[in-house]
Amino acid sequence: MTNTFMWPFFKTPVPQEPQETAVAEAPLAPALTEVINALPDPALAVDGQGVVVAANAQAAEILEAEPAGRHLSSAIRVPAVLEAVAAAARGEEGASVDYEIRVPVPRSFRAHVSSLGPGKGALLVLRDLTREQQIERMRADFVANASHELRTPLAALSGFLDTIMGAARHDEKAQTKFLGLMRSQADRMRRLIDDLLSLSRIEMNEHLRPSGEVDLVQVAGHVRDVLSGMARDFDCEVVLDGPGSLMVTGSRDELVQVMQNLLENALKYGSSGKRVDITLRRQHDAAELSVRDHGPGIAEEHLPRLTERFYRVNVQESRSRGGTGLGLAIVKHIVNRHRGKLTIVSEPGLGSEFSIRLPLKS
């Protein structure tokens, strides 16, 4: 993509001002830099040739590179934004442009473009709309998903109450049985609401990369110990193999949640009376953690949908084992927030392997 295409005003050279005017305007850049650095939003100043002459720290963070001194098209590859900046640099009226980027995670922005005068350049201020759009989507999703998934346990609770108040009114043994079933349904609703809230929080902050330092080997060992009781219940051996430590950039609490969801799934659905292998290794500039079970495996047609909200390979089995259908969706969004990658490999009869790959701590 050429600069001429992205910046139409290059086709007609900008008239040169007399030397005296150029000298008089020289102090403009330092003044612009002060103004831009004082702005709370990401901001950049672009000269008449499309080169970024000043940018604040927020702009460098969003663009994941220092844009000053580079052509704007190397940092923002959105034709509508570049055309608006080109027009403003020619002295035309400013404009606002909404746009999205998809890599490394989806984000939405509104670019406010203002002219600094004919031939002098333009000021570009970016407003991150990602969070407010996500909040709006999550409100709608939460209501739709919660109402759908809560309908079954609520109907069961209502039925049990009718029985206790009717046919079992004087039957203490039946009342005890139905109260136990009601407790089970209430626990199911609590788990569902907890997972929905957890997923909503993660999605809300997915565009913000965590900055902590986490030992992935320590996280795996901790989760193995926490779930040792569950492993005994399923008569399953959990084997951990890895180096002394693997440091990654991330949130410890979220990575514990990832590890716990993966190991719980392996124990519940894959390895009753068998074994689960947790393997950690360094792969060039990344850390890889895999959880492998030796259970029945998953048919190929299900694999692309496993991380969808509420998608279950076997609905009845999942619900009977206390699953909410949100565990792998939570894993996917946490891994995305950490700029990592989730890989699922499975074949019927040969078990399943869930692997995450995260950047090493630099």
What are these regions (language model features)?
Residues L216, G297-R305:
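Short helix N-cap motif at coil->helix boundaries in the Bergerat
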Residues M204-R209, M247-G250:
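Conserved micro-motifs of the catalytic ATP-binding
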Residues R339-G340:
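Conserved glycine-rich
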Residues P18-A59:
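Sensory modules in modular signal-transduction proteins
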Residues G212, R232, E237-L246:
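Conserved catalytic submotifs in the C-terminal HATPase_c
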Residues S184-M189:
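Short alpha-helical segment of the dimerization/phosphotransfer core of two-component systems
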Residues H71-R131:
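PAS-family sensory/regulatory modules and their coupling/dimerization elements
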